Amino acid sequence: MFTCINCTKMADRGEEDEEDEARGSTTPNTKEAVKSLTTQIKDMASKFSGSHKQSKPTPGSSSSNLRKFPDFDTASESVPYPYPGGSTSSTPAWDLPRSSYHQSGRPDSRFTSMYGGERESISAQSCDVVLEDDEPKEWMAQVEPGVHITFVSLPSGGNDLKRIRFSREVFDKWQAQRWWGENYDRIVELYNVQRFNRQALQTPGRSEDQSQRDSTYTRIDSARESRDWTQRDNNFRPPGGSVPHHFYGPPMDAARITTSSRDEPPSMSNASEMQGEWVEEDEPGVYITIRQLPDGTRELRRVRFSRERFGEVHAKTWWEQNRDRIQTQYL
């Protein structure tokens, strides 16, 4: 009999479908594979990011560690370099507070270096100590009421006499010249004067303006050129307080003394407002500045250590060991 054409076509399609299924069972689907691979990569990435978050430091931990030692951190942040005067030949000056010494029950030792104002300070209990370079330092002494002398401390020891001022309320021109003539030798010996500052010696004549309060009286010739000059002991220490009002030494020629009135208005440089201050060498490399107050008491103004003999730690140790002795001996 004849075969149906439609049936033949359907049979052919069935065979083709069977062949496709056979191929599909042996070859993986490309989309399925890509999707599976993408899922695996995402899983790995999520695991990696999770472990990274666990090892990440907590916020603020680093900043808290930086401030674990606040004293050290503060000191390190406040140290400008290098030391005063641009010289490293000496250790930093100890400025002492303007008050009488009081014992403190707790030690408070703190080193702070300041260079460029240039100063290194140490504070021990109730006083601050500064280590300074061995450069010349000016200081003023009230020899007696109305007489103030400005000195410059010399690195090699002794003092340079820079200026003498007399109060107009106590001295006129001739009284001042007479006083200087009578007291010159005593001043040289008392304050261990090694030389005079010649720049301050020649001054103009006296002005008649009464608003000018003080005069400067200086010697014209250097003391080293004087026949009467003798080298003084570098270890001589001027005593504290006022010295006797009259001292009759060899008179000086009035022509060797000149006077001048200062042009500036009255200020703290006026003799009636000044306070006596002097420097004593306690031991080699240790210089102590003492001030005489108007009520007769003394205060410790400054302790200086030479860098050639003292480092910071050595200076601090020395001050802690000798503080009580210094207060008792000089105040």
Curated annotation (Swiss-Prot):
Residues 25-41, 48-66 have a biased composition (Polar residues). GO terms for cellular component: nucleus. Keywords: Nucleus, Repeat. It comes from the Eukaryota. Residues 137-192, 276-331 form the BRX domain. The keyword Cytoplasm does not apply. Expressed in roots. Residues 221-235 have a biased composition (Basic and acidic residues). Heterodimer with BRXL1. Overexpression of BRXL1 can rescue the short root phenotype. However, it does not act redundantly with BRX in vivo, presumably due to a much lower level of expression. PANTHER family: PROTEIN BREVIS RADIX-LIKE 1. May act as a regulator of cell proliferation and elongation in the root. This is Protein Brevis radix-like 1. The gene is BRXL1.
